[in-house]
Amino acid sequence: MRRLLLLARADNFATGSLFSFVLGVGLYGLTYLYPVYLARVRGYSALQIGETMFVTGICMFFMAPISGKLMQRGVDPRIMLAVGFTGLAVGTYQASLLTSDWDFYELLVPQILRGISLMLIMIPVTTTALGTTPPWKLKNASGLFNLTRNLGGAVGLALINTLLNKRLDLHLARLHEQVTWGRAAAEEALAKLIEKMAHFGSDASLAATRKLALLVRKQATVMAIADVFWGLTILFLLIALLAPVVRRPNPQGGGGD
C-alpha cells in the first residue's frame, strides 16, 4: 500500500487517469440512472425527464467559468477534486434515500450538487494528471488521458446496469416472499385492490393481482436504484480521499524533469 502511495506522489498521471475514469462513471452513469428511475418508477415521458433533469445542465453552465477562475487564482486543484468528488458523494447519498414518490423537488438538491461537483472536477483533473508530465510525454499522455473518461463511462454504465439488474432480482425475490397467500398484510392489500376494481366484474380479482404485482416490481426497482446510488456514494468518497495523496501540479501546466 505504501509503495502505491509513493508511486502516486511520484507520478500524477496514473492517479489523474483514475480520477478521470471515475469522473466518467459519475458523468455518464448518473445521466443514465436518473432517467431510469423517472421512466420506470414515475412513468415520465422523454420530455418530462428532460424538464426534470435540466437543473444539472444549468448548474454546469454557470459553474464552468467559476471553476476556471478558481484555477486561475491558484486554488489547489487537489482541493477542488476532493470537494468535487465529496459533493458527488453527498448528492448520490441523498439520492439513495429515494422513494417511489420522489419528483422534481426531491431530486433538485442531488442534481444541483451533481452539476456543481462535475465542473469542480473536470478542469482540475486534467491539470492534476498532466501537470507533472514531462513535455516529451505530453502528446501520448494527453491522448491516453482523454480515453479514460470515455472508458470510465462505458465501464460504469455496464457495471451500473448489471448491478441494477442483480439487485432488482434480489429485491423481487425478497418481496415475493412477503406477498404470498397466508400473509395478512398481503391478503388485506389484495382485498382492497379487488374492491377498488369492482367495475371489472368477474375479472376484478385478476386485475387486482396484476396491479399488486406491478406495485411490487415498482418497489423492487426503487430499492435496486437506491442500492446503486449507495454504491456510487462509496466510490466517490474513496476517490475523494485519494486527492490529497497526489503531488500538486505545476501551475504553469504540463511539464517536469
Describe the role of every protein-language-model region.
Residues 145-248, 254-257:
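Hydrophobic transmembrane architecture of multi-pass small-molecule transporters
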Residues 1-140, 252-257:
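Transmembrane core module of solute transporters
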